[in-house]
């Protein structure tokens, strides 16, 4: 596993103020400080929409993330938005593929449930997907060599691939800004204290 250093992310360890992955907890102020320490221009000025949502672009490396915060997320504490932007910046620095990923960020109660789903994507032939993964692997990376041989996986010839993954693999236009490539719902029903 490759670990990014603070210098590679354009951050100082002083600005992070305890955000190391091994830290038990990070304060809201530390998240805001870390996001503020992002390189100049890493986060665009917000574009405000009539429905109360707002969109920012985050770019520190290969990927560009267009984050559309719903009205509740836009009104959430600054530390929440700063944390999401910081996470996007870290991923942007770590993933070198040139693509634009459009994510909807929701801040709402879910009634106590949890869920995961692919919001938008396509079905891809398993043989093609395996070849694309091998072709896009970093030099010397053999992890995809261990995928099941043959034309099917668990009896299926087609595999669901999210738009974000399809963009990075070149299966759809990598910089299409009209697609919703994914979403993240942050559950406000879970107590934070």
Feature names for model-found ranges:
Residues 1-193:
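Extracellular zinc-dependent metalloprotease catalytic-domain scaffold
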């Amino acid at each position: 596993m490759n670990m990014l250093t603070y210098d590679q992310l354009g951050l100082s360890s002083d600005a992070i103020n305890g955000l190391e992955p091994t830290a038990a907890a990070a304060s809201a102020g530390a998240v805001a400080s870390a996001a503020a320490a992002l390189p100049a221009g890493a986060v665009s000025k917000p574009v405000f929409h009539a429905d109360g949502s707002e969109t920012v672009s985050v770019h520190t490396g290969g990927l560009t993330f267009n984050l559309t915060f719903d009205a509740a997320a836009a009104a959430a504490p600054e530390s929440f938005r700063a944390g999401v932007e910081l996470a996007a910046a870290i991923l942007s620095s770590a993933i070198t593929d040139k693509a634009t990923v459009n994510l909807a960020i929701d801040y709402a109660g879910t009634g106590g449930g949890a869920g995961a789903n692919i919001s938008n994507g396509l079905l891809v032939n398993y043989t093609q997907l395996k070849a694309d993964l091998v072709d896009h692997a970093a030099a010397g990376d053999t992890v995809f060599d261990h995928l099941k041989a043959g034309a099917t996986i668990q009896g299926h010839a087609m595999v669901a691939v999210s738009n974000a993954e399809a963009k990075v693999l070149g299966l759809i236009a990598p910089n299409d800004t009209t697609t919703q490539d994914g979403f993240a719902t942050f559950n406000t029903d879970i107590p934070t204290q």
